[in-house]
Amino acid sequence: MTALERLYNAAVVPVVVLDDAADAVPTAKALLAGGVDVMEITFRTAAAADSITAVAKECPDMFVGAGTVITLEQCKKAVACGAKFIVAPGYSEEVVSWCVENNVAITPGCVTPTEIMAAMSHGLKVVKFFPANVYGGLSAMKALSGPFGGIKFIPTGGVNDKNLAEYISAPFIHAVGGSWLCAKADIAAHNFDKITSLCKEARKTALGFEIAHVGVNAGDAEESLAVCRALDAAFGFGVKGGNSSNFAGSGVEVMKSPYLGKNGHIAVKTNSIPRAAAELAKNGFTLDESTAKYKGEKMVAVYLKQEFGGFAVHLLQK
């Protein structure tokens, strides 16, 4: 898995400011306990290099990178300490060139068309957008994604638990960065349980799992329609016909022939099927790729190989 794939799957990239390198590993472990396996340790303090070294050595499951990298010297030092990716607040030709030449993942800060074009000239497809709340937030990135459709953004600055869902659901957002997950004060006070809790909530928001509908296996098209009409007669759900199934309202799908799941199926909506797949894989669940449905090149539905209480489960892209 590439560095950019790790960042995408994580969805949230904690921006970590450490005054004491001794807090680096406990902070990393708190993030991991909350389901977040990437962290950006910023070069805003003298403890940054030692902190990166400690996490790289002692927390192999954590994908650690360096942030607020302004100079080439900082960049080289960060990589030597074990940083797997570099994040810069602005665009530096010197830093970007070195990273590209040395196969180091970098997301430079780009908020103008000129900066984005400079990043593209090096083959970069993901850039940092900072400070997002100052430079127009989602509306600005949406406008930039028009002429630069191949570019994805990692906004930082003004992103928090209240607007995370709005940010992460935008198609031009690769991931989001922020310090709200592990505030400097919480690290200093060793409020690691709080950090873990915030990470769990952020991951829950980013994945956006919701029950979409329940599927019923009917014997044939006639039975499917009859079931839907009966539900409509009882509850006024309405009936909507389809190619392989009929719906009673939006909550019950009745298949026109027996399909997956002894008892039927459950559809679960998510903000991102790729992120959901990565999360499910961590917990021992796998996708049945043969059932995948696409809209263009984007997967919009796919079943899991496992059943739950006799029900098959499929993901549904929001």
Per-region residue spans from a language model:
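N-terminal beta-strand motif that seeds the catalytic metal site of vicinal oxygen chelate
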Residues: 3-17, 203-228, 261-268
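Conserved, mostly hydrophobic/aromatic
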Residues: 14, 31, 78, 127, ...
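Catalytic beta/alpha-barrel core
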Residues: 15-17, 37-45, 62-70, 83-91, ...
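Catalytic cores of alpha/beta
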Residues: 27, 71-81, 114-122, 139, ...
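Glycine-enriched alpha-helix->loop->beta-strand junction motifs that scaffold or abut catalytic
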Residues: 32-37, 58-62, 80-86, 101-107, ...
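Glycine-rich phosphate-binding active-site loops on the catalytic face of alpha/beta enzymes
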Residues: 89-95, 128-138, 172-195
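C-terminal helical cap(s) of enzyme catalytic domains, especially alpha/beta-barrels
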Residues: 99-104, 185-207
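Vicinal oxygen chelate
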Residues: 251-256, 281-318
